[in-house]
């Protein structure tokens, strides 16, 4: 066993060491980089395949490996990396190599004429191959960007300690991978060659050697082309030549303007100097031999050098400018700065610094500070730092912190002690100090420049104090203000504009400073400054004071004004002096604008550089300031600047994938993006294509018998003409469907129109072509096509001998108007073209389009013929259209279907149809008459013919009778002869031997059918005939036997008589007829049988379908009801068993949960719930329903046996699991004895300091009236299904009287819900820190739940749980009882547990999105958790008080609540509803008062803020005497709005958008026309101009206040004023007030003084005067105004001192000696980078406990701004994004016993 463990341990440790070693990691990463191939591999493979000779192959591989080695070295060696990364390297390497490669391939003996040996190394081709592979390996990252495999080594090298070893191992790994790769390629080439040889051997093809030779030569040219293309791949991204770019032209223009301004300034200065030359001769003579006498010469030399460098600089950047303006992909813009910050450079800079008494690596150290420190150490020996030991640093840091902390804590504790004495001295609260100049006059600085309020301003300000009224003129003060200060306060108008003044200085005091300054210059400057005249330094005259000129002051100082827009700012490039070392942010050297700015006309620039959303500027109206009636563009050039344009910006609806990209910049290589449609909103990923909705083009539905039946049934129903009661409903539904289909069709048509318009807009030069085509079509139509049609029509009329209609036709032709419109359809005029119509597009609208008519009717005839308006219900067609490029007419632009034109032949055809109808009518009358006469004639003929035929038939019958008589006589005579012959035959033997056998006749039996049919009758008739014939034959035979004599006939004769033949024929015919009849009857029978069977089958199927449908439905209903009944019976049985074995309270819990979940499920069907939202009862009830195995029982037993969790599980649950499942241990079982219950909960509650009430206070709580009142309140609250009171608790505290005890504990248990969240948090902390089985006391502070053990355990059950922003514990800390609070407890239910059943409806109605997270289901879970848990919604206490929309949205929920109140107890909550309805009305009044523009007023809250922080902006605006005069009312009122609210939305109602836009289009046309009447009336008739929208009639009311006064605008929603709540102008006071409110805690939240809360009311006007009055002040309405029921200890100290004390408490000096944790950021010098502030120390003392308890009060949880406070305090940094400078464990983890 020992040997086995030894082996295993060694193997594991050895494997871990090998895997984690630098060599293995380097080999792995180097091998992985082999797979990052580039164009260099192509040249290497080309050399191995195409080149002949081993020397060339070796040179190619050596060049390739050398290039890769250089790339690996460049990762470690920074100068080499910078050199290879510079853009000039590409131009230096590629361009000369291209030349050499071209010459080497085209000239065979180029540089090789001396060396005849082709395989020599000195041969140029071998060198060329070597350098080719080397250069391409270096240029690989430029041409084809390196993959992630190549970047792995670059990433890991920053994490490895031994960087050189890692690089060498990675290079070796790459070399191994390269060898394997080349070997594999060699094997592939050999296999391909063998395959080709085998093919050549089998197929004998004579190869053409000349073709192969040409192909081999062409390969060189192909590779040359490929090489040139790869070079251009990167070089092609460079913009055009620098001099021809638009930015260069702008820079040149700016330079010329600056030069002109400089010349003008020099001329003005020279003129002023000449005028005052005589006065200043003595002063110049005195100052001439001194320091600045020869400065100008030196300045001229430096300027010349700068000019030379400025001339040479563009020559370098002609081919490549790495700072070019289109280099970045994105452009982060900031209007406050002149240029834009570059975003691709990292802001992190690593350097060592001292922090917390240790030397650490800081990655946010200012780089300029480190460079300055190095420069000082290199140049001057005085600035070298002494190396301080680790212990000295820690000791000094610890001592300073200890001293600071002791002072602050002592001061703080002294103030608290004074508060405990219940006295009210003035000095308890530390007030904020403000800087004053004079105490008597009370002149103090403004808030912007007060260092105690806003930090140091770093400037010199004199006599600028706010309380006294300032004069209009200010004195010229000296000002050297910081650049940052000037930038930040450039837009504010709360301080005066300072002017520069000549500074008066003391020359003698300046001498030493100047000497030291020039000594510094000699140290730092490369060139000597001996040319400066130092002789005059000591030759100052004896005058103590003098004046310095402004030019000489620029030599030393760099001045800047606060206002950046001032033209008098000193040009910093021309100033020479000390460069201030500040943190220089990398900025672009260009200031770019986007397309929108160019369209809006903010900056007058010819070209924009940033692409924005595709938009076009549509000019609606161009107004000239001199002449209002002249709107044409053909004006003089002098008047063009005076024009004012009314324009709109039209945005394209195409998907915008450009996203503010700079023109000409490198595009991001976007992969895995698919565009499935021609026009789609966004790019889709192929991963989600399956989840997208796809339209199916074909539908394959299998037709079942039931479907056929229903289709047949519907078809029958349609044929029926019965009118049911549902007929009208069906008609309404059909009409509604038709309307919906019509709307959908219009939407599709609109979408199609937009797509066509966008397509025209996206194609290059499409708008130019389309515009030209439209204009040509309009000209052709107006002047060629229509006149030619008029001429031809009238000529034809003349030829047809009709009068021509020239005047009528030309009148209609002149009426047709062609109005030029914008691309959107906004009408301009006939002559005015829209601006940039060739690029932006144009539409041509035809008003009163011409219709060629064959004839014109007279007006009298037209007016006489009037139709009934009721009958004429057809809608009139629009009398306008738009022209297309094909000359067609459409109703709307880009409509797909052309308009049906009025045909010239339509009226002719109508007339012809009318005439044809008349002819038809006449013809049919004639036909009718003819038909009647022919019918009469035919009837008479029939009658006569019948008579004739009857007479003939009678005669024929008479003849037939006579013939029959004759025949009978003859027949009898014949039979006599036959008898005689028969008797003679009897004598012959033949007759005896051969007797005649007569055929027996068989009667045809009829079919036994009950129904008599035609076939049966026929059969009967045939049978009767056959019977008659048989009887005749029998009778005749009898007569023959009677003795007729027949003559003898010879028996040998073969002839028979004619009589016998006739009989046989008749016999045969009868037999044939009988057979045919029988066959026919049989066939008819089978046919009828088949037909009957078929009909029977069809009808039975139909009948079965009819019967089966209700049978199936009934069966399904019965089965479902049976299941429901069985399930309900089973549930009832299980519930009865649970009721018998468990406590009744659990049923109450579950019923409430079921009700709440049911009400919630009605709103959202598929919501996922979090486990934390469920209660214990619900979870354990679900567990109990599962058949738990023994294994799981033991697991649950382990859960319940854990001593920490038993207090969090309810006793009912424990009893249930103990009694039924047998899981819980018996000692944890709930006992009914009060003593055991008290002992059980005292172990838990002894750490809760809230249960700290006195006995007197407790006795007040036990009163019966108070108890009953709370009980009623809680019962009502439970009926409302509120989440906060859905639990019942067990008993906790025992009093002396058992009756009072039971009643009291029942009421008290309700408050246990408030403690649920805190206990749950503690359970989580305990579970997380279970491994560290150490007590909480090691951290040195008391638990927030620790209480006084001497006092009785009690709790205030009237706690109002309000949710403020101190979540240190979720239990209320108020320990006093106020009857007022109980009285208004429902009104003040603004606590953590809201009525989430009501709020959930509101949240789900206002859902954020309808996305279905198919792949990322975790996001859906979090989203649903936020929807279903309204208690995590932020409380309105933080937000602005004028957000009225939120209050208006609450009215729905209040109305719903009112319904439920009416159901339960309306008389109880009537008052509550009134109070809740008051707040929206009050907010509405407040809102309207704020929107009032005539009387701008502020809310009470803002007035309170103004009293503390000074006058408001509106008051300051009133005092301003130099107020700007506005030209019109609208401009003045808009500025008034912007002054107060910064921005407003003035928008129309959505339902009126289309109508309003149509009105605007007509207005734009009517404004330009002179004769408006005709077109206005026609547009009103057509419905384009709606009169109900035209409310604005007078110019006097066309102002914002005029709109507000009219109720019609607001009621109809035409004019809406909505404030944008994003930001406010100069609102520092408001934000400071809101920040201060976070520190405040309301009086209903906590109460520190346990003994007497009324005595602890102190004067808190400093903090509470900003708080607006709330409903909670009803509690203290009978008390004094100056006293409040709260003391917040944190507010005793000022904000700055409080912050300092927090920081010092965090930096615990006692934890310095503990060893720090090792992190991955430790470097070779072992500089610690992280420390554990809160170390585990068991030696606890009293002082430390006090300090840590103070920390709990002074350091609230969830205060991220304190991180920034530490940052600014400790390192004096101003960048708020650096939260990770000091890495400390600020919030300790809670650990319970």
Swiss-Prot record:
It is found in: Plastid, Chloroplast inner membrane. GO terms for cellular component: chloroplast inner membrane. The keyword Protein transport applies. The keyword Transport applies. Keywords: Chloroplast, Membrane, Plastid, Plastid inner membrane, Protein transport, Transmembrane, Transmembrane helix, Transport. It comes from the Eukaryota. GO terms for biological process: protein transport. InterPro entries: TIC214. Its main location: plastid. Belongs to the TIC214 family. Involved in protein precursor import into chloroplasts. May be part of an intermediate translocation complex acting as a protein-conducting channel at the inner envelope. This is Protein TIC 214. The gene is TIC214.
């Amino acid at each position: 066993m020992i040997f086995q463990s030894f082996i295993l341990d060694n193997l594991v440790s050895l494997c871990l060491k090998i895997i984690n070693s630098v060599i293995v990691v380097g080999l792995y990463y180097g091998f992985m980089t082999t797979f990052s191939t580039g164009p260099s591999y192509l040249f290497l493979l080309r050399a191995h395949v195409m080149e002949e000779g081993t020397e060339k192959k070796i040179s190619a591989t050596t060049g390739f490996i050398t290039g890769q080695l250089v790339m690996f070295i460049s990762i470690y060696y920074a100068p080499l990396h910078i050199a290879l990364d510079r853009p000039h390297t590409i131009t230096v390497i590629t361009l000369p190599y291209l030349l050499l490669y071209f010459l080497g391939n085209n000239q065979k003996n180029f540089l090789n004429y001396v060396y005849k040996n082709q395989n020599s190394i000195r041969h140029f081709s071998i060198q060329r191959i070597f350098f080719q592979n080397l250069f391409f390996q270096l240029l690989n990252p430029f041409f084809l960007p390196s993959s992630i495999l190549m970047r792995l080594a670059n990433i890991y090298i920053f994490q490895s300690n031994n960087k050189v070893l890692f690089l060498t191992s990675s290079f070796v790994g790459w070399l191994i991978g390269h060898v394997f790769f080349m070997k594999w390629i060699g094997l592939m080439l050999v296999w391909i060659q063998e395959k080709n040889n085998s093919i050549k051997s089998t197929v004998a093809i004579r190869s053409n050697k000349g073709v192969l030779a040409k192909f081999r030569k062409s390969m060189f040219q192909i590779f040359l082309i490929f090489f040139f293309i790869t070079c251009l791949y990167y070089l092609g991204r460079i913009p055009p030549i620098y001099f021809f770019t638009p930015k260069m032209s702008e820079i040149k223009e700016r330079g010329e303007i600056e030069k002109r301004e400089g010349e003008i300034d020099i001329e003005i200065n020279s003129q002023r100097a000449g005028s005052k030359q005589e006065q200043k001769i003595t002063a110049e003579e005195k100052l001439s031999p001194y320091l600045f006498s020869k400065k100008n010469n030196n300045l001229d030399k430096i300027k010349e050098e700068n000019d030379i460098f400025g001339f040479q600089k563009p020559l370098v950047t002609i081919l490549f400018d790495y700072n070019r303006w289109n280099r970045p992909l994105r452009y982060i813009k900031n209007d406050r700065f002149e240029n834009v910050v570059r975003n691709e450079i990292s802001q992190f800079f690593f350097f060592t610094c001292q922090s917390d008494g240790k030397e650490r690596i800081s990655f946010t150290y200012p780089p300029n500070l480190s460079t300055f420190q190095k420069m000082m150490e290199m140049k001057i020996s005085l600035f070298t730092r002494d190396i301080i030991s680790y212990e000295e640093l820690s000791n000094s840091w610890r001592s300073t912190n200890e001293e600071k902390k002791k002072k602050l804590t002592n001061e703080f504790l002294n103030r608290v002690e004074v508060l405990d004495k219940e006295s009210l001295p003035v000095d308890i609260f530390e007030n904020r100090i403000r800087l004053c100049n004079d105490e008597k006059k009370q002149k103090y600085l403004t808030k912007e420049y007060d260092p105690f309020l806003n930090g140091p301003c770093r400037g010199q300000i004199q006599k600028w104090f706010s309380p006294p009224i300032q004069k209009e003129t200010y004195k010229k003060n000296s000002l050297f203000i910081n650049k940052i200060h000037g930038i930040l306060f450039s837009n504010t108008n709360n301080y005066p504009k300072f002017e520069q003044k000549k500074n008066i200085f003391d020359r003698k005091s300046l001498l030493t400073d100047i000497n030291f300054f020039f000594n510094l210059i000699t140290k730092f400057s490369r060139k000597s400054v001996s040319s400066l005249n130092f002789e005059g330094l000591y030759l100052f005259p004896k005058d103590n004071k003098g004046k310095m000129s402004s030019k000489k002051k620029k030599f030393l100082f760099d001045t800047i004004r606060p206002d950046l827009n001032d033209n008098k700012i000193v040009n910093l490039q021309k100033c020479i002096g000390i460069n201030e070392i500040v943190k220089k942010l990398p900025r672009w050297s260009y200031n770019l604008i986007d397309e929108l700015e160019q369209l809006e006309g903010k900056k007058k620039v010819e070209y924009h550089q940033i692409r924005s959303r595709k938009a076009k500027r549509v000019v609606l109206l161009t107004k000239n300031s001199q002449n209002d009636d002249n709107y044409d563009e053909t004006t003089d050039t002098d008047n063009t600047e005076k024009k004012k344009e009314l324009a709109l910006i039209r945005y394209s609806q195409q998907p915008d994938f450009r996203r503010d990209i700079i023109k000409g910049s490198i595009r991001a290589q976007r992969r895995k993006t698919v565009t499935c449609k021609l026009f789609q909103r966004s790019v889709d990923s192929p991963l989600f294509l399956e989840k997208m909705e796809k339209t199916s083009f074909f539908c394959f539905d299998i037709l079942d018998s039931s479907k056929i039946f229903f289709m047949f049934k519907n078809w029958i129903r349609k044929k029926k003409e019965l009118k049911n009661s549902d007929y009208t409903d069906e008609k309404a539904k059909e009409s509604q469907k038709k309307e919906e289909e019509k709307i959908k069709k219009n939407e599709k048509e609109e979408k199609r129109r937009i797509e066509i318009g966008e397509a025209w807009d996206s194609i290059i030069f499409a708008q130019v072509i389309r515009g030209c085509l439209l204009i040509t079509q309009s000209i052709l139509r107006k002047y060629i096509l229509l006149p030619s049609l008029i001429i031809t029509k009238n000529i034809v009329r003349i030829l047809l001998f009709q009068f021509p209609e020239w005047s009528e036709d030309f009148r209609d032709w002149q009426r047709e108007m062609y109005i030029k419109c914008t691309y959107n359809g906004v009408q301009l005029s006939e002559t005015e073209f829209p601006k940039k119509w060739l690029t932006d597009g144009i539409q041509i609208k035809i008003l009163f389009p011409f219709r060629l008519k064959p004839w014109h009717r007279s007006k009298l005839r037209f007016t006489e013929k009037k139709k009934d308006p009721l009958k004429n219900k057809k809608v009139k067609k629009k009398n306008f259209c738009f022209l297309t490029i094909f000359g067609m007419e459409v109703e709307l632009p880009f409509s797909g279907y052309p308009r049906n034109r009025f045909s010239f032949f339509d009226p002719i055809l109508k007339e012809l149809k009318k005439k044809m109808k008349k002819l038809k009518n006449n013809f049919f009358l004639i036909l009718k008459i003819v038909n009647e006469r022919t019918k009469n004639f035919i009837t008479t003929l029939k009658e006569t013919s019948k008579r004739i035929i009857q007479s003939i038939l009678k005669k024929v019958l008479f003849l037939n009778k006579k013939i029959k008589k004759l025949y009978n006589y003859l027949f009898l005579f014949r039979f006599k002869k036959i008898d005689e012959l028969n008797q003679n035959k009897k004598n012959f033997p033949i007759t005896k031997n051969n007797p005649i056998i007569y055929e027996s006749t068989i009667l045809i039996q009829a079919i036994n059918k009950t129904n008599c049919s035609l076939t049966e009758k026929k059969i009967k008739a045939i049978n009767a005939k056959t019977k008659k014939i048989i009887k005749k034959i029998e009778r005749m035979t009898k007569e023959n036997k009677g003795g007729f004599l027949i003559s003898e006939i010879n028996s040998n004769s073969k002839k028979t008589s004619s009589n016998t033949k006739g009989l046989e024929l008749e016999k045969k015919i009868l037999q044939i007829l009988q057979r045919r009849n029988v066959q026919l009857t049989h066939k008819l029978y089978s046919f009828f049988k088949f037909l009957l069977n078929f009909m029977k089958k069809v009808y039975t199927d139909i009948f079965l379908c009819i019967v089966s449908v209700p049978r199936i439905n009934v069966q399904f209903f019965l089965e479902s009801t049976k299941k429901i009944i069985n399930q309900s019976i089973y549930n009832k049985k299980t519930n009865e068993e649970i009721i018998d074995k468990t406590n009744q309270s659990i049923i109450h819990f579950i019923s409430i949960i079921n009700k709440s979940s049911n009400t919630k499920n009605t709103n959202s069907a598929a919501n996922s719930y979090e486990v934390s939202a469920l209660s214990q009862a619900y979870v354990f009830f679900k567990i109990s329903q599962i058949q738990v195995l023994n294994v799981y029982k033991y697991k649950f037993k382990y859960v319940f046996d854990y001593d920490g969790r038993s207090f969090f599980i309810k006793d009912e649950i424990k009893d249930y699991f103990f009694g039924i499942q047998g899981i819980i241990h018996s000692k944890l079982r709930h006992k009914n004895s009060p003593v055991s219950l008290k002992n059980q909960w005292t172990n838990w509650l002894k750490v809760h300091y809230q249960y700290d009430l006195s006995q007197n206070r407790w006795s007040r709580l036990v009163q019966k009236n108070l108890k009953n009142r709370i009980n009623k309140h809680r019962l009502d609250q439970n009926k409302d299904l509120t989440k906060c009171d859905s639990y019942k608790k067990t008993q906790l505290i025992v009093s002396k009287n058992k009756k009072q005890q039971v009643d009291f504990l029942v009421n008290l248990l309700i408050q246990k819900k408030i403690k649920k969240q805190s206990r749950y948090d503690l359970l989580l902390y305990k579970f997380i820190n279970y491994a560290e089985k150490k007590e909480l006391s090691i951290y040195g502070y008391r638990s927030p739940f620790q209480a006084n053990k001497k006092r009785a355990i009690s709790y205030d059950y009237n706690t109002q749980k309000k949710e403020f922003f101190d979540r240190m514990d979720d239990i209320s800390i108020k320990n006093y009882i106020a009857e007022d609070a109980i009285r208004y407890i429902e009104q003040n239910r603004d606590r953590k547990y809201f009525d989430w059943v009501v709020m959930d409806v509101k949240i789900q109605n206002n859902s954020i999105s309808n996305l279905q997270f198919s792949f990322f289901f975790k996001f859906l879970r979090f989203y649903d958790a936020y929807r279903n848990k309204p208690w995590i919604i932020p409380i309105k206490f933080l937000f602005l008080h004028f957000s009225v929309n939120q209050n208006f949205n609450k009215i729905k929920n209040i109305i719903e609540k009112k319904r439920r109140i009416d159901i339960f107890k309306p008389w109880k909550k009537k008052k509550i509803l009134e109070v809740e309805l008051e707040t929206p009305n009050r907010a509405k009044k407040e809102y309207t008062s704020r929107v009032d523009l005539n009387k701008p007023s502020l809310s009470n809250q803002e007035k309170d803020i103004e009293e503390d922080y000074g006058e408001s902006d509106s008051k300051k605006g009133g005092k301003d005497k130099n107020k700007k005069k506005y030209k019109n009312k609208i401009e003045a009122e808009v500025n008034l709005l912007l002054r107060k609210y910064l921005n407003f939305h003035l928008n129309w109602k959505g339902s009126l958008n289309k109508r309003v836009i149509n009105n605007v289009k007509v207005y734009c046309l009517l404004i330009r026309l002179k004769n408006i009447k005709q077109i206005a009336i026609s547009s009103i008739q057509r419905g384009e101009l709606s009169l109900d929208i035209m409310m604005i009639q007078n110019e006097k009311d066309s102002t914002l206040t005029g709109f507000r006064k009219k109720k019609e605008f607001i009621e109809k929603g035409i004019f809406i004023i909505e404030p944008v709540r994003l930001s406010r102008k100069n609102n520092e006071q408001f934000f400071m007030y809101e920040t201060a409110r976070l520190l405040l805690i309301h009086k209903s939240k906590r109460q520190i003084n346990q003994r007497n809360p009324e005595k602890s009311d102190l004067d808190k006007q400093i903090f509470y005067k900003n708080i607006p009055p709330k409903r909670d002040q009803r509690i203290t309405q009978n008390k004094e105004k100056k006293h409040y029921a709260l003391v917040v200890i944190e507010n005793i100290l000022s904000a700055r001192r409080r912050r300092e004390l927090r920081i010092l408490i965090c930096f615990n000096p006692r934890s310095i000696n503990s060893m720090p944790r090792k992190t991955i950021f430790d470097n070779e010098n072992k500089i610690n980078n992280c420390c554990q502030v809160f170390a585990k120390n068991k030696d606890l003392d009293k002082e430390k406990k006090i300090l840590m308890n103070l920390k709990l009060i002074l350091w609230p949880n969830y205060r991220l701004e304190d991180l920034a406070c530490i940052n600014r305090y400790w390192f004096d940094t101003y960048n708020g994004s650096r939260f990770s400078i000091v890495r400390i464990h600020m919030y300790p983890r809670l650990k319970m016993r």
